[in-house]
Each structure stands twice: as C-alpha cells, then as structure tokens.
Amino acid sequence: MQKEVLNVETPEGLRIIERIPVTAGSVILIGFMLRVWAGLHTVIVNPDGALYIQQAMAIHDKNWISLKTCALTFISAYPFLIAVGYRLVHDWMLSARMISLICGTAMLIPLYLIVKEWVRKDNAILTILVFAVTPVLVSNSVEVIRDPIGWFFLSAGIWAVIHRNTPCRHGFLLAASLCFLAAAWARIESILFMAITLAYLLYDRKNTKTMDILFFLSPLLVIFFFSLAGMMFSGLTLGDLHRGKEIAGKFIEPIRQYRLMADSLKTLVWSSPNPFVEFFLPEVRNHIWLIAMGTVLNRFLEAFFYPFVVFYFLGLSGIRKYRSDTRLLYLTALTLSGLSMLYVHTLQTWMLYYRFFGIVMIPAVVCCAFGMEKLRDIISRKWSSEPVIVFWVLFIVIIGISLPKNLKSGDTDKSVFIQIADTISRHAPDAAAIKTATSRHTQIWISFYANLHRAGTPPCPLDEANCWEFYPDDPALFRNRLRQNGLQFVLWEEKHWLFHNFSLSDLMGSADYRELGRWHHRDTGQMILFAVNGPNN
C-alpha cells in the first residue's frame, strides 16, 4: 500500500534559517571571530561594567537592597542576564562578556533579513559584512555594556515590523513590541523606536488595522503587571524598572542645561587673564548649538568608520528610488529621530560615546545596502567587470581596511591594576570583603577585582568613603578615618596624591603601614600599596 505523503508546512523559525545562505553564515562567523579576538585582548573591565556585575552579584544573592546603592539609579536587563549566565559558566566576567558577544553577533541575522527585502542576496551579504567588521560594533560587542543587548532587540523588532504583512501579522507585531520593550529595558533610549513604530502604524492605515495596533500595544499592559509583581517580591518601586522620570527629563533637561552652559560661559569672559578670550567666549556662547552639531558629526564619522561612510551616502539615492514603499519611510524616520535624540543628548550632557550611534546605524542598514548596490553597479560599468569579481574584491577590501583597527589591542597596560588587586586579595583574610583606600581614578578597578572571586555580594566598587580625596590632610586624622571606615589597604598614587601635610615619607616612616608592592602606570605615575596595620585590620 502506498504511503500517504503529508505536506507539512515549515515552521517560521526554520524558514528564517533557510533564508540565510552559507556565505551569509560565513560572514556572521567572521563577525563572531573578530569579536572573540577583541574579547580575548580586552584586558580590563570598563568602569560601568563593574557596576553591572556588582548588581548581578546582588541579584544572584537575592540581596535586593544592594541593587541601587552603588552609583546606578536604575536596574536594566543586563544584570539579570549576567546572573543567569553565571549559573551556566560560574565566572562573572565570562558571563558578562558572553552576553555582549552573543547579542552583538546575533544582531547580524535580523539585519541581513531586513536588507534582503530590498536588495539581492549578494548585496545583502556585503552589507552585513560591513556591520560584522565595523570597529565600533566589534569592540563594543565584548565590553560589559548594555548596548549590544539593545542592538539585537532593536534589529529584531525592526525586522518584525517590516515583515508584518504576512498571515502571522499579529504575531510579528507582538514580537516587535516585545523586542522594543526589551531593548528599552537595556537602553532606555530605545523606547524611541516604540514611539516611532506606533506613529508609523497609525500613519500607514492602508496596511494597518485596528487590531494590529492593539496587538502592538498589548505587551505594555503585561509589562505593567509584571512590574507590580516585581515590586511585591523585591521591594522595588515601579520607577526602578521603567525609568519614566528619566524619559520625561529628556525633553526638559537639555533646555535647562543649555541655559546653564550659556550663563557659565558669560561668567568666564571676565575671569580669564587672556584678553582674546573676551572676544572668543561670546562667540562660543552664541553658537553652542553649532558646536553640538559639529560634535555629533565628528562622532558620526568615527562611529560609522570613515571608509564605510561612502556606502551610506551612496545609498541615499536608493531610498528616493523606493520612496513609494512606506517601510523605507519608517526606517528613515527611525534614523533621523535617532540622530536628533543624540543631538539633544549632546546639548544636555556633552558626553557622546561612539557606541551610542548604534541606534542610528541599525535603521540606516538599508541605506548601506543601497549604497553597496550602487557602488557595485558603478564599478561593473566603468571597468566592465564580472559581478562575481566585483563582489569578492569588495569583500576583501571591506575586511582589509577594517582589520588593522579590529586587531589592535587596547589598554593592555591597565593590567597593572588587576595585579594590584590580586596582591590585595592575597594579603586579605579569606572571609572578609576587601576595602582599599585609593583615588577616585582607580577605586572602581581595585575594589572590583580585589573582591571579584569572594563569596557574597561585594562592597560597592565606587564608594566615595574609600576615596582618600575626601580624607583629612593630616597623618593622624587620615589613619583614624581608615579605622572608622574599616579600610585594610592604602594605594598611594604619585599623580593623584593631593595632600600637602601628609606625604609619601609619612606613610613609609609610620608603623601603621606596611609596604606590599610597587607599580607604575602612565596615568597615575608610581603606585605603592600599603597594608594598614592595627588591631582592627
């Protein structure tokens, strides 16, 4: 008897995998290997990362009180993921870097699926190669920061929105909403994508039904109830989780800071001994907005990587060609709103890191794809080259021009701070948490690494009570402050030691201190570690 052949539909998840050809998978593997290399050659944790790991330790120990007592006023998704990863690998640093690595690499998959909606597979492959090797994305995909988590969920959310015109439209919109909320939990700025997407759905009424909008908004209610449950079990407030006050402050604070900056510059005009400053500062005061714009432009070019910027600019014409496609209008709105937000952020804080431009790069991926397509057409026509030859030439060039920057090892000299922390840990009692008096410049690294492998939630690695800048300039009073705060060690730093009545000779000549070792770093000068002698230490 002939067997009946069943026509089983391939699940959507498997269809997504089938859409990724071998070459695209190889590009993702290249991106992964570059990130692994960067991770293996990243010597020391970034300062923010120490605070996230400290929060993760508190979560692991169910020490909810310590979650917001150490510099950070919010609780993002990252510490929870680190705590989960620690249960698998039993190493805090490995867990934190592993999460960034996975998310920073996985974002390439939805980006490929996005650009494949408009360009051929070969051009889509070259586009994600650009994202796989962009130095800012590579280096920050192994740092202990929240951005890679946000990048992945933003990419996945955008893909779900532009792919919503399928029989599973409600499922895609629900997934998009969850992705944007997850991204916002990692980086609060990502809530902008939620707002722009809602505006887009309301605008594109031709392809959007009322139920679509309801499905998109439904996770907000679920998140609200989960937040209430979290409050009941952990004692946290709703504001600890959604950071609503910070979102509202983004609209008001830049205006206030702009006025404060203008007033400060006005005061400086008469306080400088240089007569030319009297004419220079009023010009600066009147053009603060222009300086902020120049700052954003500079960081934009650096973050996107100068050689790769040409792809994005060439792709602008491609957007005009498909202007009837409302999905491109959506991506353009995301890109421009991201740039606008970074400009406002600059006016507010004047701190603009390269990694912040991830929220601009992601929606601009289609612009890069159009630019890649146009560049290949130009090269093929001008030199009458075969498309496959142009493909592999560009493939090699893209990797080649980015490789020197991606293989460069940074901050290797900072391993000296880990050596100091290891020395402290060896000379401290096994059961006790370690507290060391240092300058504010080194406190977070020394405290973090000295307590990293000790049981329980460690002390805050950014506690001003352990920074000797706030101590009295008197040997006896200094020693009393150490005893009051329970500090077991003192790190003298040549360039940061501010005391006049309390010098290195007082430390070395006192029976209260015992020298343990000497080190040197260009930022601190010579460093000498002392153990604090006494009945309480």
How would you describe each model-predicted region?
Residues I28-L34, T127-P135, S139, W159, ...:
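Short helix- or helix-capping micro-motifs
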Residues G25-I28, L178, A195-L198, L217-F224, ...:
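Signature aromatic-anchored transmembrane alpha helix within multi-pass, membrane-resident enzymes
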Residues T436-S439, A450-S505, R514-N533:
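Luminal/periplasmic acceptor-recognition loop/helix of membrane-associated glycosyltransferases
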Residues K3-N7, A160, P167, L192-F224, ...:
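Perimembrane helix-loop-helix junctions
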Residues F395-Y449, H453-L462, P475, I528, ...:
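Membrane-embedded, lumen/periplasm-facing catalytic core of multi-pass transferases
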Residues N46, A71, V136, V142-I149:
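Short acidic/glycine- and proline-prone juxtamembrane loop motifs at membrane-interface regions
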